[in-house]
């Protein structure tokens, strides 16, 4: 009767030890022996090594998760700072527009005030020169009248002039009602 060993072939019973020339069977037996020796001697070390590797991987994953959470938190902080900066920039822009508008209004008001002062000065200047012109005309007319009076006085008074002056005063007396 034959007994099958791992489907590798038929081994006769009770024949004892001998040289097995089937390379495939011997390789499997050798491999099984090596695996058994490795597992028995290296098994604990290998399982410890695998456990250390598992712990390292778990720690790396936890650290990566923690770093990701920290990065997310820093990102949120940066986003908040960006929003604050945008609000501040908007406020600064609005304040700049407000100040520019205010400055323009101040300049316009100052310009209008200067224009009104210039208009007032112009009116005063025109009035001054009008008064000066009237005064010069008045002085000229008075000087002409005075020169004509002097001429008349120097020439002497003739009879017709006496009659005109006397008639003037007589007419004034007749109009007088006390």
Swiss-Prot record:
Please give the positions of the paired cysteines in each disulfide bond: none
Top-level lineage group = Eukaryota
Bilayer topology: Single-pass membrane protein
Q: Which organism is it from?
A: Tetradesmus obliquus
Which protein family is named in the record? Belongs to the ATPase B chain family.
In alphabetical order, the GO MF annotations are: proton-transporting ATP synthase activity, rotational mechanism
Report the subcellular localization.
Plastid, Chloroplast thylakoid membrane
Organism phylogeny? Eukaryota, Viridiplantae, Chlorophyta, core chlorophytes, Chlorophyceae
Describe, as the record does, how this protein assembles with itself and its partners: F-type ATPases have 2 components, F(1) - the catalytic core - and F(0) - the membrane proton channel. F(1) has five subunits: alpha(3), beta(3), gamma(1), delta(1), epsilon(1). F(0) has four main subunits: a(1), b(1), b'(1) and c(10-14). The alpha and beta chains form an alternating ring which encloses part of the gamma chain. F(1) is attached to F(0) by a central stalk formed by the gamma and epsilon chains, while a peripheral stalk is formed by the delta, b and b' chains.
Q: Explain the purpose of this protein.
A: F(1)F(0) ATP synthase produces ATP from ADP in the presence of a proton or sodium gradient. F-type ATPases consist of two structural domains, F(1) containing the extramembraneous catalytic core and F(0) containing the membrane proton channel, linked together by a central stalk and a peripheral stalk. During catalysis, ATP synthesis in the catalytic domain of F(1) is coupled via a rotary mechanism of the central stalk subunits to proton translocation.
What is a single cellular component term in the Gene Ontology annotation? proton-transporting ATP synthase complex
Q: Which residues cross the membrane?
A: 23-43
Fill in the misc note: In plastids the F-type ATPase is also known as CF(1)CF(0).
In terms of InterPro entries, this protein maps to: ATP_synth_b/b'su_bac/chlpt
- Name the record gives this protein: ATP synthase subunit b, chloroplastic
Q: Name the keywords, alphabetized.
A: ATP synthesis, CF(0), Chloroplast, Hydrogen ion transport, Ion transport, Membrane, Plastid, Thylakoid, Transmembrane, Transmembrane helix, Transport
